[in-house]
């Protein structure tokens, strides 16, 4: 019918907008990462042999701000924010270790909740942000040792996003509305954030490559 045709066209347009906006957001994160890695202060934080509490806290604040930017630049739809926040939180754990990862997750998670108090996905997205921090922290040692392949990073990011979808289904009510939301956002968020994570981490890797070349 004509109504069904119009509905399908609206869905296609919306999906295109989601992918385009996520691509822009990933580009913004990569630009921020590139600018940060050119700051002597930030490079020093990453390259310290024995990181102090100050250094770890500073890194957590930096990654927390990156994650907050991802929330603000996300696309609002059906009570949720389609965003790239997982990149900042997961990268914090992988690059900085458990302390940095969990503190970043707390900063980003609390902000996400306060950003939309009482919102459809406010609690579920805040909880999933903490889970992302845990995942990054758990795999930090493997990542830092260089044993983590690009495919594994993609799988880890995808797993974090799948976890977020499950948490939304478990916490956000009514279930039918949560399921309708997941059907719209799951594929673009899983695909785009998995690819974006690789590019983002590669930008920070340049810090260590530069060190080895000196």
Task: Label each residue range with its predicted role.
Residues 78, 89, 93, 101-105, ...:
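Alpha-helical transmembrane segments and their helix-entry boundary regions
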């Amino acid at each position: 019918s004509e109504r069904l045709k119009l509905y399908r066209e609206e869905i296609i347009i919306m999906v295109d907008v989601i992918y385009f906006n996520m691509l822009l957001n990933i580009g913004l994160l990569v630009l921020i990462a590139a600018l940060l890695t050119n700051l002597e202060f930030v490079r020093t934080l990453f390259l310290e042999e024995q990181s102090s509490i100050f250094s770890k806290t500073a890194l957590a604040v930096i990654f927390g701000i990156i994650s907050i930017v991802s929330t603000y630049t996300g696309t609002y739809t059906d009570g949720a924010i389609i965003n790239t926040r997982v990149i900042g939180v997961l990268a914090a754990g992988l690059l900085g270790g458990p302390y940095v990862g969990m503190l970043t997750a707390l900063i980003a998670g609390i902000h996400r909740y306060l950003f939309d108090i009482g919102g459809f996905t406010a609690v579920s997205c805040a909880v999933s942000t903490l889970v992302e921090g845990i995942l990054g922290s758990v795999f930090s040692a493997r990542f830092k040792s260089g044993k983590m392949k690009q495919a594994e990073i993609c799988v880890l990011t995808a797993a974090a996003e799948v976890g977020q979808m499950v948490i939304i289904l478990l916490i956000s009510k009514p279930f039918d509305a949560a399921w309708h939301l997941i059907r719209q956002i799951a594929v673009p968020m899983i695909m785009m954030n998995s690819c974006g994570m690789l590019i983002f981490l590669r930008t920070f890797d340049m810090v260590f490559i530069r060190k080895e070349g000196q």
